[in-house]
């Protein structure tokens, strides 16, 4: 409920500030409410649809094979470990799956903390010790228990709304300026206006990605802390040390990558969904 109130308050604040700025700049604000509704529908619509089908998409895109009946001792241990950690975290048992990939990675997804999926790669399952795997599983279970999927969906919805809303407001200001300085008062024209909106969508979209990445990194530190409580600090540190010693993670769909144990490196830390492994290890050692 707190997230919903935060969501409403954030969008109302966006509308209020935009309306004040538009009034100062002399832009007609009579359609601001309609524009915000339009932006929110599209901004949140895509995010919530993506969240609703996240488990289905993960299974299809990653080729996840859900363990219904363990076929061997390794799968039995995997299911038992997640079962124990889920009980410790106070959530319903997530589905447990394995996907074929040589790289060591894992992810959690799902529309809610009581309707989730935890998946591990074959590279991780057979390339790590059980203590290290236990640390990884605890990290993913912590993502689920913390409600990170819903939290980041709300954040993504807010920034999507901002991008759609702000791009069209700024384009309107530009159109108004051009119109006021044009003898014919025609403004930008439809195609030029659409071009300006497109460019602004891209620019604001980059800013939005930085904001989402910032919150994602915070959630990663929180998931590491949760993993230390569920499995023990030493196991979580050992898992991160093993990941640091291994090759960089390859491509993974963005929604799964955001909740993976290990993210891809970027040209700049502020664009990364995951903090550098060195910082995560240091944070655990100093906690």
Swiss-Prot record:
InterPro entries: HtpX_protease, Pept_M48_protease_HtpX, Peptidase_M48. GO terms for cellular component: plasma membrane. The active site is at 140. Binds 1 zinc ion per subunit. Keywords: Cell inner membrane, Cell membrane, Hydrolase, Membrane, Metal-binding, Metalloprotease, Protease, Transmembrane, Transmembrane helix, Zinc. Zn(2+) binds at residues 139, 143, 220. It is found in: Cell inner membrane. The chain crosses the membrane at residues 4-24, 33-53, 154-174, 195-215. Its EC number is 3.4.24.-. Its cofactor is Zn(2+). CDD domains: M48B_HtpX_like. One of its GO terms (molecular function) is zinc ion binding. Coiled coil: none annotated. GO terms for biological process: proteolysis. It holds the Pfam family Peptidase_M48. The keyword Glycoprotein does not apply. It is a multi-pass membrane protein. Belongs to the peptidase M48B family. PANTHER family: PROTEASE HTPX. This is Protease HtpX. It comes from Shewanella denitrificans (strain OS217 / ATCC BAA-1090 / DSM 15013).
């Amino acid at each position: 409920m707190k997230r919903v109130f935060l969501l409403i308050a954030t969008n109302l604040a966006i509308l209020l500030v935009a309306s004040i700025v538009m009034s100062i700049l002399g832009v007609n604000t009579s359609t601001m409410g309609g524009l915000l509704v339009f932006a929110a529908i599209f901004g949140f619509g895509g995010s919530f649809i993506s969240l609703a089908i996240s488990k289905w998409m993960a299974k299809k895109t990653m080729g996840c094979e859900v363990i219904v009946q363990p076929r061997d001792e390794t799968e039995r241990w995997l299911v038992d470990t997640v079962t124990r950690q889920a009980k410790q975290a106070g959530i319903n048992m997530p589905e447990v799956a394995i996907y074929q990939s040589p790289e060591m990675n894992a992810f959690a997804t799902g529309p809610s903390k009581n309707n989730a999926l935890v998946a591990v790669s074959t590279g991780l399952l057979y390339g790590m010790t059980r203590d290290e795997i236990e640390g990884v599983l605890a990290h993913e279970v912590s993502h689920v228990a913390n409600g990170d999927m819903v939290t980041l969906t709300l954040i993504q919805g807010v920034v999507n709304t901002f991008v759609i809303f702000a791009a069209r407001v700024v384009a309107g200001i530009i159109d108004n300026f051009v119109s006021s300085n044009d003898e014919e008062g025609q403004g930008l024209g439809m195609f030029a206006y659409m071009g300006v909106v497109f460019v602004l969508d891209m620019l604001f979209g980059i800013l939005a990605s930085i904001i989402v990445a910032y919150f994602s990194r915070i959630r990663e530190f929180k998931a590491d802390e949760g993993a230390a409580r569920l499995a023990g600090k030493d196991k979580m540190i050992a898992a991160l040390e093993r990941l640091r010693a291994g090759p960089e993670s390859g491509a993974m769909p963005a929604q799964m990558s955001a909740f993976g144990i290990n993210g891809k490196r970027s040209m700049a830390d502020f664009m990364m969904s995951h903090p550098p492994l060195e910082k995560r290890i240091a944070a655990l050692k100093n906690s």
